[in-house]
Amino acid sequence: MNDPRSSQHQPPRTLYAVLEFGRAVQEMTTLLPANRWLSGLPGGDGQPVMTLPGFGGADGSTSLLRRYIGKWGYEAHPWSIGRNMDPGSARNMGGVLEFMADVVRLVGARLHAIRKKSGKRVSLVGWSLGGLYSRQLAATYPDLVRQVITLGTPFGDPRSTIVWPIMRRFIDSPEPPEADMARWM
């Protein structure tokens, strides 16, 4: 660890990651009192908006967000393809990459259907890993995606996150970190 370049890819301290849960709870409890203020915001334009959940999440994890999106006058859609990265799909890096390709293909089909029905391009709201998918979907289907909004999406080198060592253990990768890194990017 004497290489000065390796220090730039150190994950944050575990304490900071543990404290994130408390911060998330605090932010959720402020949502209810803020409801009156949020209700006074200008209404949407009826555009279709799809939510994409974070790692391990499914449509239920974005249901409150979709409720607000619908309340603001947008046409809210779940991604409707199940859990984001179920453990069976993530046994190795090949499985992860295959799952990601399936997500782009399946959500792409949903985007086509929504565009055909509404005549409008779809805005994507991606939470965490869902934000990474949203960016890939916009690049793959620019004629179907109006805009991308990301919430807590991990941009940058994944080795600088608390999740990197967990993901490497989770997928039981035999590759050196640099090889996994190249496949992710």
Where are these regions (language model features)?
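Flexible, membrane-associating and regulatory peripheral segments of lipid-active enzymes
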Residues: 1-50, 56-68, 72, 78
